[in-house]
């Protein structure tokens, strides 16, 4: 069954509910999305080599998802959607203090599919056990922030387009400063 997501303007203003497939087909429709970067007490960031219809087998932030319009008529908050993604993708059940560090827009088309998103850049700290669901990713790794930034700069093709855009937000506010 197709999930229902929230179409929005470039500034994130809600427009209407749409099937996820509409948001990602052809030119797509701009819609609300989330990417989350988890870091640990050592200052490392958690990356995932994602299984993805459009951007398969490249590095992503820790997790990415969309706030959903639920069957009960409510919309997930950014925090609820982020917690859902971390639970589904890594079996993280404990609460993580999440912060939204800002939004960015991006569009990328590959064949008949696309990404057309107004994306929240969420972050949170976690030092617990990870059990990645093999249906969502090939592997994960903890990496030093500085090494991560150097690799994104030197090998941008190894990263999802939203990672490259999200890094700009993180650098602008000083989150990825050494």
Please provide the spans of the model-predicted regions.
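A short coil-to-beta-strand element that immediately follows conserved catalytic motifs
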Residues: 93-103
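Nudix hydrolase/Nudix homology domain
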Residues: 59, 63, 105, 113-178
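Conserved Nudix-box catalytic region and its N-terminal flanking loop in Nudix hydrolases
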Residues: 23-34, 44-84, 88
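A structural signal for short, well-ordered beta-strand segments
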Residues: 36, 100, 120-124
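Helix N-cap/coil-helix junction residues
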Residues: 91-92, 175
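Acidic, metal-coordinating catalytic segment for phosphate/diphosphate chemistry
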Residues: 1-42, 50
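Short, solvent-exposed loop/turn elements at beta->coil junctions and helix N-caps
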Residues: 21-25, 103-109
